């Protein structure tokens, strides 16, 4: 329907889909076939962390991906990352040919001791790697704000809560792309409206975002992004993110 070069297509190699090096190419070819394309613009080693990185090394997943790039079946090889900055430093040192890194990056996690958004971003910059941003609105947490936090942003010049969160992330040097999960046409139109003629946050907006940070931290809310990975492995199929959201909402109601 549209020329292939007119859109960017990304896929990922998840560790659960291969047990040995020989499994990777057939799986990759099945991904191309499923998408009906001859190549992927980006191919990411999925969810790299201390728990699975060695599996990728043992199965020569990176070497296979680099070979696929040499064959023209992948334009850029990268990783999506979910761990501490020191682990990212090790991976980029081990594999300097990695071209792009996808990290969780938003204003609430910027200095979070567990997520380490800022530190991971700084590692990417030191290694000269462009960044793909995931979770810029933290699974909707930075859209569905507590009333007092929403009031801070409402006092600005009319942007949506999502707009301030996404512009915060996109305003840093080296950000190649900001991935925003959208579930309605209205959300897409909102994103397009402020990214078409992009402007980073000004000083007043940044101060407001910092105030929202302070409000969130004062409430001690559960830092769930609603990625739902936990539900996939739950033997009872419990909707864990919904329960955590309900718990946070109840705590917020009691504090009013």
Language-model segment annotations:
Residues 236-247:
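Iron-sulfur (Fe-S) cluster-binding segments and ferredoxin-like electron-carrier domains
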Residues 6-17, 43-48:
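A short, structured active-site edge motif that brings together acidic residues
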Residues 35-51:
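Active-site groove signature of glycoside hydrolases
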Residues 245-256:
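Single conserved hydrophobic/aromatic residue that forms the stacking wall/gate
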Residues 48-223, 229-238:
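Beta/alpha (TIM)-barrel catalytic core signal, keyed to glycine-rich beta->alpha loops juxtaposed to Asp/Glu
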């Amino acid at each position: 329907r549209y020329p292939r070069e007119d859109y960017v297509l990304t896929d990922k190699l998840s560790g659960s889909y291969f047990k040995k090096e020989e499994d990777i190419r057939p799986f990759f070819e099945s991904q191309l076939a499923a998408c009906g394309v001859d190549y992927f613009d980006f191919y990411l080693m999925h969810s790299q962390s201390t728990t699975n990185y060695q599996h990728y090394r043992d199965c020569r997943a990176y070497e296979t991906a680099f070979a696929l790039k040499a064959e023209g079946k992948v334009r850029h090889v990268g990783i999506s990352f979910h761990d501490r900055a020191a682990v990212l430093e090790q991976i980029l040192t081990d594999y300097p040919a990695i071209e792009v890194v996808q990290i969780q990056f938003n204003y609430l996690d910027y200095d979070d001791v567990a997520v380490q958004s800022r530190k991971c971003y700084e590692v990417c910059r030191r290694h000269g790697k462009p960044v793909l941003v995931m979770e810029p609105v933290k699974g909707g947490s930075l859209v569905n704000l507590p009333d007092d936090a929403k009031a801070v942003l409402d006092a600005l010049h009319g942007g949506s809560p999502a707009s301030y969160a996404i512009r915060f992330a996109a305003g840093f040097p080296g950000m190649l792309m900001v991935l925003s999960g959208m579930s309605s046409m209205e959300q897409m139109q909102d994103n397009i409206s402020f990214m078409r003629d992009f402007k980073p946050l000004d000083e007043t907006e940044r101060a407001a975002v910092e105030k929202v940070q302070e409000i969130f931290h004062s409430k001690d809310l559960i830092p769930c992004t609603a990625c739902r990975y936990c539900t996939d492995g739950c033997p009872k199929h419990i909707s864990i993110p919904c329960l955590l959201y309900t718990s946070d909402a109840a705590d917020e109601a009691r504090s009013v």
